[in-house]
Amino acid sequence: MSLLITSPATVAAAATHLAGIGSALSTANAAAAAPTTALSVAGADEVSVLIAALFEAYAQEYQALSAQALAFHDQFVQALNMGAVCYAAAETANATPLQALQTVQQNVLTVVNAPTQALLGRPIIGNGANGLPNTGQDGGPGGLLFGNGGNGGSGGVDQAGGNGGAAGLIGNGGSGGVGGPGIAGSAGGAGGAGGLLFGNGGPGGAGGIGTTGDGGPGGAGGNAIGLFGSGGTGGMGGVGGMGGVGNGGNAGNGGTAGLFGHGGAGGAGGIGSADGGLGGGGGNGRFMGNGGVGGAGGYGASGDGGNAGNGGLGGVFGDGGAGGTGGLGDVNGGLAGIGGNAGFVRNGGAGGNGQLGSGAVSSAGGMGGNGGLVFGNGGPGGLGGPGTSAGNGGMGGNAVGLFGQGGAGGAGGSGFGAGIPGGRGGDGGSGGLIGDGGTGGGAGAGDAAASAGGNGGNARLIGNGGDGGPGMFGGPGGAGGSGGTIFGFAGTPGPS
């Protein structure tokens, strides 16, 4: 019965509807009573008299049953009406104590918060005030014990967005406000810091729109400064040159993690009538947590795509963040982000993917991040961007510690057009003191044009070299990596 919901208004409406049905039936029964209970005899013979008497008896029995049914109907309608009244009374009785309790709670909080509100401008318990729209006003700080920071207000024309308010002991930072529009867009506000014990950093505000100039930069994500919490996401860059030739705004970086938590993701670069904006870098982990993902580069409608942000560094026990994807460009593709390095124990982040440069050169894939200083694998390299000048695959990250495998090289991008080769495969990363080298990336596909595979990574002391990546359309396969100096076998060359 916990899922049963009763609406007194609905019950009362149903009772009224049923009462109308009963009234209509009573009218119909009354109209039918006279012609059915007193039938005229068709003839003077006994058969006609008996038939008329039989039908009259049926009619009288029907009227008797109808009277009983209508009596039951009236009782049912009365019960529904009474139920609606009782439910409404119960709701009223329950609402009054709850409203009184809420009033008492608010009064208590007002009394408790009054001293610190007067002295420090912030409550003990409660959320900070939000900044007003179109003012660029900063969000208020959250309660000293509990409460989120207020959100920053959006900026007016040529005005930066407000910063998000900081939390107190427990709570999340407020969001940064969106930057205001202008000939050049204004900056988005930074996200507020998370609580000293628990809480995430607030996201940064997006950059403002540039009507003929550059888009505004996105605000940085707030840091998680306490024990538990993740960094805030960086704000995306503003759109640039909607009526002109401006560049996209650069995105904000992700916030740093708490001791236990992940770095914030970098924001995406803004779209530009000329070049795309830069993607924001991923925030770093601190103790136990991963680095944030790098933001993608922005689209350059008549120029180059924006370069992507790099992945954040992993914490002591954390993976590096993946690099962002380069921005699409009308001329050149934006550079891919590099994967973040791990801390002491974990794996490097993957390199970001390259991007198409529709008028000239597509970008190569990003290099994978290095593995942990004690043990951990290198991150894989990113894919090369496709195009008429396809990008090469990214190199795999190295395993720099005691144990670990080198990261695999990324595949080359596909070549577009007659006789256009694909990109070369990326080389594999080297292994740890004990560990194998990474596999070389395969060559990108092309129009019957030869392209080469990447080389396998080398082992160091104990381990096998990585295999070379395959070539394409007669292009050479990558060389196998060398085996360990103490023990190990060389990698197999890739097929052509």
Swiss-Prot record:
The UniProt record lists the keyword Secreted: yes
Occurrences of domain PE (ranges): 4-94
Main location: secreted
Superkingdom of origin organism: Bacteria
Localization: Secreted; Secreted, Cell wall; Host mitochondrion
GO cellular component annotations of the record: extracellular region; host cell mitochondrion
UniProt-listed Pfam families: PE, PGRS
Induction cue: Expressed in lung granulomas of guinea pigs in late stage of infection (90 days of infection).
Function: When expressed in host mitochondria, induces mitochondrial stress which results in mitochondrial membrane depolarization, up-regulation of mitochondrial superoxides and release of cytochrome-C in the cytoplasm. The cytochrome-C in cytoplasm triggers the activation of caspase-9, caspase-3 and caspase-7, leading to the apoptosis of host macrophages. Being a late expressing protein, apoptosis induction by PE_PGRS1 may facilitate the M.tuberculosis survival and silent expansion of its niche at the site of granuloma. When expressed in THP-1 macrophages, promotes the survival of mycobacteria within macrophages after a 24- to 48-hour infection by blocking endoplasmic reticulum stress and inhibiting host cell apoptosis. Can chelate excessive intracellular calcium in THP-1 macrophages, which reduces the concentration of intracellular free Ca(2+) and blocks the PERK-eIF2alpha-ATF4 axis, thereby inhibiting the endoplasmic reticulum stress caused by infection. It also reduces the apoptosis of THP-1 macrophages by decreasing the activation of caspase-3 and caspase-9.
Domain comment in the entry: Contains 7 GGXGXD/NXUX calcium-binding domains.
Entry similarity comment: Belongs to the mycobacterial PE family. PGRS subfamily.
Protein known as: PE-PGRS family protein PE_PGRS1
Organism ancestry: Bacteria, Bacillati, Actinomycetota, Actinomycetes, Mycobacteriales
Gene symbol of the encoding locus: PE_PGRS1
